A protein has these predicted regions:
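Binding-site signature for planar aromatic cofactors or substrates
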Residues: 1-341
């Protein structure tokens, strides 16, 4: 199905040129967990593609167990819409070498300040499981300010066939290393105090995770109080999580509270050192070693060799060039400069 021809031009354009989108999966307890991931959709938008590292495969494992996923695309520029997608995911890990080459062509423009001679060594990052999402429903609002109104909507035809995931490896999965799990209140004090963008993930009546950006977050005794757009459809209660940049993620239970919603926080998720230290390309040996051990074990589960990163940076796909152009436009216009304090 060619969604590029079906959706309004502004909606299709945002899906095609956005570098990062919020991506939510459901854990084994049915809690939605959101992480911002690099976005590389098919040219016709029949599939929206994401990926996670084979050395940290939790997102893919969740999507294979429960294929219901949610996405949120937030505008960078005036005139762009807000787009929310729910769909069914298919996990692709039959050929990690092919996945890596595909991912390089779609995303290696990111972090242009780091030389390719450095980035190419990060096999723990480039070895990828691809997650292909077929949209089931797409909602959009003309702008963030319009989100108190009901959304526009597209739904997949009832006879749509959704592709299954590749079969899971026969052997049991590997365990994640024990990374730091910060005190939720200290993390919340920093995030709320800095007024960082906050993304709430909750579960709708059909069991799909939905991601929405909170307008206002306030720290309370045992949780967080949030203001949500009135036009956001579906229930506002149940298992939920709130994330800032995919770094601090607060997990708990959501309930309506006097025109707002309240997340009673149970815990925060551990922080991957790549995210916490901001060093994907050249991490400390004590960080790199457990990722490499897990990568080798996950490859062995699949009977696949260690993928080989090319010596020269691969040519970017047309979609990657469009996304890089949009990112550069923002930098050229000074939109991403740090504001004076």
């Amino acid at each position: 199905m060619n969604l590029k021809e079906i959706l309004p031009e502004k909606v299709a354009d945002l899906l095609l040129v956005t570098s990062f989108a919020e991506f939510a999966t459901l854990n084994a307890k049915g809690v939605p967990i959101d992480t911002p991931l690099l976005n590389f959709p098919d040219e016709d938008l029949s599939k929206i593609n994401m990926a996670t590292g084979l050395s940290y495969p939790a997102k893919a494992e969740r999507a294979r167990r429960n294929p219901k996923v949610g996405l949120l695309y937030w505008p960078l520029y005036p005139g762009e819409p807000v787009v929310q997608v729910v769909g069914l995911a298919a996990v692709r890990d039959r050929n990690i070498q092919d996945n890596m080459e595909r991912y390089l062509a779609e995303t290696s423009h990111v972090a242009p300040e780091t030389p390719w001679t450095v980035k190419r060594k990060a096999i723990w990052y480039w070895a990828r499981i691809v997650i292909e999402i077929q949209p089931k429903e797409i909602l959009w609002w003309d702008s963030p300010e319009a989100m108190d109104q009901p959304p526009h909507r597209w739904e997949a035809p009832a006879d749509t066939v959704f592709a299954p995931s590749d079969p899971a490896p026969d052997s049991p999965g590997t365990q994640s290393p024990k990374w730091p799990e910060p005190d939720w209140r200290k993390a919340a004090e920093t995030d709320v105090g800095a007024d960082y963008p906050a993304y709430l993930s909750l579960v709708d009546h059909d069991g799909f995770p939905r991601v929405v950006r909170a307008r206002d977050v306030r720290l309370e005794a045992d949780g967080l109080s949030l203001d949500l757009p009135a036009g956001m459809p579906g229930r506002r209660s149940g298992p939920a999580s709130l994330t800032y940049f995919g770094r601090d993620t607060f997990v708990g239970t959501l309930a309506e509270a006097g025109g707002r919603v309240r997340l009673t926080v149970e815990r925060t998720l551990p922080i991957l050192p790549f995210v916490g230290e901001g060093n994907i390309w050249d991490p400390a040996p004590e960080v790199k070693a457990p990722f490499m051990r897990r990568l080798e074990a996950e490859l062995a589960r699949r009977g696949q060799p260690m993928p080989v990163v090319p010596g020269d940076q691969p040519q970017l796909s047309e979609g990657a060039r469009l996304r890089a152009k949009r990112d550069t436009k923002g930098a050229d216009e000074g939109m991403f400069e740090r504001k004076a304090e």
